[in-house]
């Protein structure tokens, strides 16, 4: 604490804000001092209507995408809050979700790198080669997801469970549900890795932002959430069965994204 008072949730919020401010300052300073690709000050202050139109055309769908996706995931907690044993269910979901985010953080790094690679290939005019590159990178991400899934299951469901669970004040029911959720997450990681790399990396890198908007949100809003409402609030299935719904999004998203990937319609030269 360094002598500072305990701020609780307020402290967590302040720390998050400060980390984002530091992140912005570091990124902006690097961009400002970069010599290989110098930041043009006049382009920031007076970008021009043509550049502004392009920016809005490709950034607006991404903004809508992230807003809808974040809102959709928040609705999962709302649904759980209206179910039996809601406190145990939400506690298990919070812990399992954080562990899964820790394990899949590398997936988003891969997706960001793929976006750069795809955009570079399209920018250099390699429109034919980028199709095979995009496919290869997506299936590489799928293979990486298999490794991550096995690691998550081995570490947190079997080997490290006796050491991790006691660190949190979970009831016996919450611990059992957390284990079930982690098993579901571990099974879904290969599809999670594939679909994230495909949507965030390949489609967005190829300028196919409208398709990525639909592919990213349709499975969540028209698949996962309605099925969760049906099973959890109407049929009132056991919580262990309800946990299987966590995999639905990726089961629906992956084949839709694979179809778009094979079509080649995601390749757009926006330079």
Predicted regions: what they are:
Residues 26-29, 44-75, 102, 106, ...:
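Hydrophobic faces of transmembrane alpha-helices in multi-pass small-molecule transporters and flippases
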Residues 77, 90-156, 193-212:
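Small-residue-rich hydrophobic transmembrane alpha-helices
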Residues 1-7, 67-98, 102, 120-121, ...:
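Helix-terminus/linker motif at the lipid-water interface of multi-pass membrane proteins
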Residues 27, 72, 76, 114, ...:
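Hydrophobic/aromatic residues in alpha-helical transmembrane segments
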Residues 2-59, 118-188, 231-271:
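Short alpha-helical transmembrane segments in multi-pass integral membrane proteins
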Residues 23, 68, 72, 110-114, ...:
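Residue-level signal for transmembrane alpha-helical positions in Major Facilitator Superfamily
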Residues 210-222, 229-237, 244:
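C-terminal structured "cap/appendage" subdomains that terminate the fold
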